[in-house]
Amino acid sequence: PPRSTLDRSSAASDVYKRQVEGFGYELSATRVGSAYDPGVGYVQRTGFTRIGDRIFKGWTAPSESSTLRHLLSMNGYLFLRNEDRSLESAEIGPEWKIDAKSGAVLTLTAKAIYEDLPYSFKLSESAHVPVGSYSFHDLSASYRLPISNMVRLTAKGSAGSFYDGSRLSLGLSPGWSISKHLEFTGNYQYERIRFPDRAENFDSHIARLRVETALTPKLSAIAFIQYNSAVDRVISNFRIRFNPKEGSDLYIVYNELLNTERYRHMPNMPLRDNRTLLIKYSYTFTLGG
């Protein structure tokens, strides 16, 4: 059937008052039609109206305290279906962010979550979430060492209910700036999900390593490797950029996808699922006046 202009459009508005100390707010409303096409890129949802986001109060700690600043906020949003104005999903909860004088940051968050699923979805071949309406909660904490340190670390953890089950999530993100020419960053994420009433479990380990080097101002390289136990795959990306002069760039990019568990399906999977080599050269012309 023909779609109205409203179905094919998207609109958004926001009002805010941002400040370091005292009360502030960030409020927004977005409407996306059911037939909306962004033209470039994509949208995760269509046919919804979203309302959010937060009110907060910030204050500076006393001079004798080891903390520098506090920010206490109430965050929340809701998604309504345009078709019948029914509630699709919602989230609300407080957050407390503490900035230390050393540069470290501690964040504590609590959430109450609602999801109405018209379709089931799979986490893996052995775990799924069925159709239904769910209310669950989550408690999380994160701690970040000062980003100015040569060695950095961010640790995160969360636990709570998850649809009709439970969830535990742990994460570590280390970083090491050896020099201005070489930097290592990593990330490890563990997810443990249990649905005891349905005897379904899901565990995943995701590990990432990124190496950046700038041998000279004109020559730099980046290497990225990721392992995901949920799909038993390793993704690698290597990129070299050579910039001999302003407006002239040469890129060499190599991508590879490896299967770490080749015998989980029949027929057996290949060791390399995908491998590409891309060479790109760009030059910017300047037209004289």
Show the residue positions of the predicted features.
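Outer-membrane beta-barrel "beta-signal"
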Residues: 238-254, 259, 268-289
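Single conserved hydrophobic/aromatic residue that forms the stacking wall/gate
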Residues: 1-12, 16
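Outer-membrane beta-barrel translocator domains and adjoining extracellular loop/strand segments
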Residues: 10-13, 37-42, 83-90, 118-125, ...
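Residues on the lipid-exposed face of transmembrane beta-strands in outer-membrane beta-barrel proteins
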Residues: 14-18, 53-57, 94-98, 141-145, ...
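Residues that define the transmembrane beta-barrel architecture of outer-membrane proteins
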Residues: 47-51, 88-92, 135-139, 166-168, ...
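Short loop/turn motifs that connect adjacent beta-strands in outer-membrane beta-barrel proteins
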Residues: 17-24, 60-71, 100-105, 150, ...
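Transmembrane beta-strands of outer-membrane beta-barrel pores
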Residues: 29-35, 57-59, 76-82, 112-116, ...
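Transmembrane beta-strands of outer-membrane beta-barrel proteins
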Residues: 23-27, 70-74, 106-108, 153-155, ...
